[in-house]
């Protein structure tokens, strides 16, 4: 297998992984899409300031093990609420004395992350209708993932992708009554299909199906929703 990197994507708050779209040239014995997302764990590019406090190799190993275990637990949600996971492996970097990096291969989920749709410094321009709908669906996704024992500790808007919406861009439809709402023409509140990505910073718990049961989930959401409405899209949590 060989990989050709294409476009650099936003990464996580951890500085070890570099995230790219990639063309995958697989051998005859490997079955996977030709276009995936590659998360490259390379301690050489770890932030210099952070190496004063953390061993980059420990951070790399911890990040990889967290992601792999998360995707193992989340197999039933792969392809719907989380990306499909196609494995991880070590690879040698050409022209760098065969230096080894570790790579995770993931489905490239179409859509945009919520931070790109609602930049934190413009979150106050989002109307209450849109904010309520976005936060509600994001929290339902959080608890659906938690039901499988994966407690996301990096629950930020950058880690939630909104899939393409059927009626957006097809016509100049305004999806709320607030004329100056930042996403009035860009987000259909009735068609919010979200995917969670990035499981480097998680806590693993016992699976608990009650987190995905509608009544129980609604109770849990109502307890934390006011805080999320005030601060989440502004990266204030």
Each PLM stretch: what is its role?
Residues 17-19, 33-41, 76-86, 150-160:
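Conserved long hydrophobic alpha-helices within structured protein cores
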């Amino acid at each position: 297998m060989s990989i050709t990197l294409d476009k650099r994507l936003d990464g996580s708050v951890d500085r070890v992984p570099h995230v790219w779209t990639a063309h995958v040239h697989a051998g005859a014995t490997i079955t996977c899409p030709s276009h995936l997302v590659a998360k490259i764990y390379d301690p050489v590019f770890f932030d210099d300031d952070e190496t004063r406090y953390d061993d980059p190799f420990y951070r790399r190993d911890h990040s990889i093990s967290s992601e792999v275990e998360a995707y193992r637990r989340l197999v039933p949600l792969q392809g719907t609420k989380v990306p499909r996971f196609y494995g991880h492996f070590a690879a040698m970097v050409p022209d760098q004395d065969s230096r080894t990096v570790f790579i995770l291969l993931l489905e490239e989920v179409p859509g945009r992350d919520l931070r790109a749709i609602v930049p934190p410094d413009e979150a106050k321009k989002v109307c209450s209708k849109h904010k309520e709908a976005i936060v509600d669906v994001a929290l339902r996704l959080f608890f659906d993932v938690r039901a499988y024992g994966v407690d996301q500790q990096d629950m930020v808007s950058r880690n939630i992708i909104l899939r393409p919406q059927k009626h957006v861009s097809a016509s100049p439809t305004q999806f709320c009554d607030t004329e100056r709402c930042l996403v009035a023409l860009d987000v259909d509140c009735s068609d919010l299909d979200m995917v969670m990505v990035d499981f480097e910073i998680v806590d693993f718990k016992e699976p608990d199906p009650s987190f995905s049961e509608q009544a129980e989930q609604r109770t849990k959401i109502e307890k934390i929703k006011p805080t999320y409405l005030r601060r989440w899209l502004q990266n204030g949590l």
